[in-house]
Amino acid sequence: MARSWSLLLLPFALALVASVAQAAVVEYTFNVGNLSISQLCQQEMIITAVNGQLPGPTIVATEGDTVVVHMVNESPYNMTIHWHGIFQRGTPWADGPAMVTQCPVRPGGNYTYRFNVTGQEGTLWWHSHFSFLRATVYGALIIKPRGGAKAYPFPVPDEEVVVILGEWWKTNVYDLQQRSLVTGNPAPHADAYTINGKPGDFYNCSAPNQTHKFELKQNKTYMLRIINAALNTPLFFKVANHSFNVVAADACYTKPYKTDVVVISPGQTVDALLVPDAGVAAAVGGRYYMAVIPYNSAVNAADPSFLYSLTNSTAIVEYGGGPATSPPMVPDMPEYNDTATAHRFLSNMTALVPNRVPLAVDTHMFVTVSMGDTFCGPEQTMCMPDDKGTIFASSMNNASFILPNTTSMLEAMYKGSIDGVYTRDFPDTPPIVFDYTADASDDNATLKHTFKSTKVKTLKYNSTVQMVLQNTRLVSKESHPMHLHGFNFFVLAQGFGNYNETTDPAKFNLVDPQERNTVAVPTGGWAVIRFVADNPGVWFMHCHFDAHLEFGLGMVFEVQNGPTQETSLPPPPSDLPQC
């Protein structure tokens, strides 16, 4: 019997050895420095970029590979790189958020990021995690299946196309963020949106070289790897005379989801097969606009033109083989405030196969995600308070997060010396219960006013956490893209209004919920997520609107060590930057 089992297992053992043998070390060098660009009426704009590119270089790896990136900071600013969506199991020092897992790399310095991509495949991305520099310091991170394209659980595309959506300011984004901090006023909206770094045809001073072109061939299947790298804006994405078959989100496969519009919040990714309407694929020389517009989810806020640029960003999808004889077709876009379309897209996707959702929950959290106010701080040397003496702030459970300034939180955890760095008292619930989404709730000064702190929630290794994320109307109701470092989570349910702990659990999808690293909490609503804390370290959870993060919309999970060396924090690398 033992011999027959050995024979049966031999092919599997050989396959495992072959898989391990095929794993590679994928190595890149990122030179971060100044780049001069002429765009939108500006003869010369100096931005911070990687390897002189906007977007930066695409990292391509295969599942199981080790990725090594040598980052050389030739810019005038501090710098870190975050590998958005990478679990960093065993490599928490490579996660990248400044003052959370590392001190930033100073100008003239360098740091080598090393991490493994085992158990992950799909579209992720990388970006700066210091100040507003990720406005131009970003790029795609593609993880291919170990079995190649034939291993895709959907029709194999003939080609794959990276589409990175971004925002563009006609000013230095570092100065923009510093001005926002010292005055206490949120930064103004972007001057333009971009597709692969270019704004398109519809802006003033647009030039032909400022519109990205995708040259396609007839009767070929294309998969778009769509990334929202914008600082502060959810986007509607369409291609005229085409629809999409969504097959993955945040590098997790989904059941095929057919739609004519993709809705994507900052931090999120979507993989979609591009489906031409009848006759399009055969139209030699056919030209179609790819377009994005902002999704304005804010309710009871300022005029949308104050919050967002309302001009479409465009690229051109062109079918070759003949002359372009007509202007590109323009897609019909949703209204800016079309929350119904946004919610339909963001909530209807499900996992491709049933997930192993943990049923027993160890830690329950109910967390309000709020805009509010606070008093001017000593660092805000040009503070401009309102008539009540307060300035804009944001918070989770009324705690407005600030980063430490002496050492990183991960170093403090590793050394066991957290005093003066952070405290272990992030609350599981808000200080009071009230009608979170009612218009009258803005009179509730208890929760609207917040205080700055660096609080973490400590979790036992391998514990299961369920978090209800509840939007509030203290200032305005708005969809917030909440991103968790170090983990994926299951999105069990989403809805509008106040979460009801008695009736809403009946809506939980415990069979095939979508798996994400960034969830867009519905405007004036809630989302329930669940994850297993099996990755020791300190892991940032925050709104992926940088305009909200800088004013405190974040918190940190401290996951304790497990029982073995493999489930405990490793020592820091020798080249870890020092503060």
Curated annotation (Swiss-Prot):
Q: Which residues are glycosylated?
A: 34, 78, 110, 116, 204, 209, 219, 241, 312, 337, 348, 398, 405, 444, 462, 500
Top-tier EC class: oxidoreductase
**Top-level taxon of origin:** Eukaryota
Task: Cite the binding residues for Cu cation 4.
Answer: 480, 543, 548
* One CC-aspect GO term: apoplast
Q: Where are the transmembrane segments?
A: none
In its UniProt entry, what is this protein called? Laccase-24
What gene is behind this protein? LAC24
